[in-house]
């Protein structure tokens, strides 16, 4: 097939559960150059007089060329095409609980932003998940008796690590020269980023988005901040959605202020990046920040709807969500909430125009 276009921009999303794919080839409305599209089961090739753009599908994903349908041109957006795919089911997500922490291991805690060691060579004898943060509200709503553990926080012992929705609780009594005050921030000595807060004289909360935990014999993994934050948040959302059958979340700061309303649409998306070379006409902005030139890649991602709540935006909707027991709160440092909002906004701006909004919400992908 051939259409008139210039400076082709390629977007390809594969839905594993639906066994379908959406292909969008963007270009200006008027003028342009000749564009040819070749589709095979394992690749997609877009040729123009100036060069070509190629998308190679990862193992386990195959297009069905004969199923091309729904062809339409949307002004200001580009050529839309839907295909059937043969795709293996989504890989089972690795639990945030088990990815970094295993009982009996000697671990080191690092600041994710700069690599500064926060806790060195800590042997963890028990790694246990905590009850849900809104457990008391659930008991009050569904049980005929009061919560027997109300106002009785769980504190880890010296070699324990308790896992919350978005944080780790550890006992730092043996690591500190003087007894810390409760409800004070834990700041990285090198980069001054907020890593967590003290809950009592012995218990410290570290946020998963700020700390990397690795076996002590290993080294600090230098992961780009945006990639790390997207991965951690995406995994948390997938786990909470699966475990508690909730798909709506309020992202709030340590002060309780709501920054983002987030609604998980699906977790089976595969977003595929075209190979890039000097002859290729355009990069795919959603992924380019974390890939090297000349490479191609595919990312598992979750698709979310979101609404920002900063500067009193969406105040009534935020109040409604906060009062809804089916909406789960996720607490992060205030600076991280703003980081996440910036990532969502950038990812939204990189999507084709027709995909950027759904009803009154904005759309974005978070890479797993």
Swiss-Prot record:
GO terms for cellular component: cytosol; ubiquitin ligase complex. Keywords: Acetylation, Cytoplasm, Metal-binding, Transferase, Ubl conjugation, Ubl conjugation pathway, Zinc. Pathway: Protein modification; protein ubiquitination. Its EC number is 2.3.2.26. Residues 214-236 are annotated as: Interaction with UBE2C. Ubiquitinated by UBCH10 (E2 ubiquitin-conjugating enzyme). Its main location: cytoplasm. It is an enzyme of class 2 (transferase). It catalyses: S-ubiquitinyl-[E2 ubiquitin-conjugating enzyme]-L-cysteine + [acceptor protein]-L-lysine = [E2 ubiquitin-conjugating enzyme]-L-cysteine + N(6)-ubiquitinyl-[acceptor protein]-L-lysine. Residues 332-368 are annotated as: HECT-like. It comes from the Eukaryota. Pfam families: HECT_2 (PF09814). Zn(2+) binds at residue 144. The modification N-acetylalanine is found at residue 2. The keyword Metal-binding applies. A motif (BRAT1-like motif) lies at residues 129-159. It is found in: Cytoplasm. GO terms for biological process: protein autoubiquitination; protein monoubiquitination; protein polyubiquitination. GO terms for molecular function: cyclin binding; ribonuclease inhibitor activity; ubiquitin protein ligase activity; ubiquitin-like protein conjugating enzyme binding. The C-terminal half (AA 188-389) is able to bind cyclin-B and shows a self-ubiquitination activity (mono-, poly, or multi-ubiquitination) in a HECT-like sequence dependent manner. The BRAT1-like motif mediates inhibition of the endonuclease activity of CPSF3 by forming hyrogen bond and hydrophobic interactions with the active site of CPSF3: Cys-144 coordinates one of the two active site zinc ions of CPSF3. Interacts with UBE2C/UbcH10 (E2 ubiquitin-conjugating enzyme). In vitro, interacts with cyclin-B. E3 ubiquitin-protein ligase which accepts ubiquitin from specific E2 ubiquitin-conjugating enzymes, and transfers it to substrates, generally promoting their degradation by the proteasome. Independently of its E3 ubiquitin-protein ligase activity, acts as an inhibitor of CPSF3 endonuclease activity by blocking CPSF3 active site. This is E3 ubiquitin-protein ligase E3D. It comes from Mus musculus. The gene is Ube3d.
């Amino acid at each position: 097939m051939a259409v008139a276009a210039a400076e082709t921009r390629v977007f390809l999303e594969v839905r594993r559960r639906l066994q379908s794919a959406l292909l969008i080839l963007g270009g200006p409305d008027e003028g342009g150059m000749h564009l040819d599209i070749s589709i095979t089961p394992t690749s997609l090739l877009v040729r123009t007089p100036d060069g070509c753009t190629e998308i190679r599908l990862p193992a386990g994903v195959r297009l069905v060329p004969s199923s091309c349908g729904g062809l339409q041109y949307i002004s200001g957006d580009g050529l839309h095409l839907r295909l059937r795919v043969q795709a293996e089911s989504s890989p089972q997500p690795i639990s945030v609980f088990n990815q970094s922490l295993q009982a009996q291991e000697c671990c080191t805690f690092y600041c994710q932003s700069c690599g500064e060691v926060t806790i060195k060579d800590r042997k963890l004898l028990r790694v246990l998940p905590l009850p849900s943060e809104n457990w008391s509200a659930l008991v009050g709503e569904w049980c005929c008796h009061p919560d027997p553990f109300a106002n009785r926080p769980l504190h880890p012992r010296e070699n324990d690590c308790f896992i919350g929705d978005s944080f780790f609780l550890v006992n730092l009594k043996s690591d500190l020269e003087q007894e810390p005050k409760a409800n004070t921030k834990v700041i990285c000595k090198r980069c001054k980023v907020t890593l967590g807060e003290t809950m009592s004289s012995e218990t410290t909360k570290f946020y998963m988005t700020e700390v990397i935990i690795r076996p002590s014999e290993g080294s600090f993994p230098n992961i780009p901040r945006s990639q790390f934050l997207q991965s951690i948040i995406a995994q948390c959302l997938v786990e909470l959605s699966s475990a508690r059958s909730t798909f709506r979340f309020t992202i709030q700061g340590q002060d309780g202020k709501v920054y983002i309303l987030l609604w998980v649409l699906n977790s089976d998306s595969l977003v595929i990046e075209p190979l890039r070379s000097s002859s290729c006409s355009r990069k795919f902005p959603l992924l380019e920040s974390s890939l090297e030139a000349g490479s191609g890649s595919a990312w598992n991602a979750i698709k979310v709807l979101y609404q920002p709540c900063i500067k009193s935006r969406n105040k009534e909707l935020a109040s409604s969500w906060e009062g809804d027991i089916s909406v789960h709160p996720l607490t992060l440092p205030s600076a991280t909430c703003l980081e996440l909002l910036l990532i969502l906004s950038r990812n939204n701006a990189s999507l084709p125009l027709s995909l950027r909004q759904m009803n009154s919400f904005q759309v974005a992908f978070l890479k797993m």
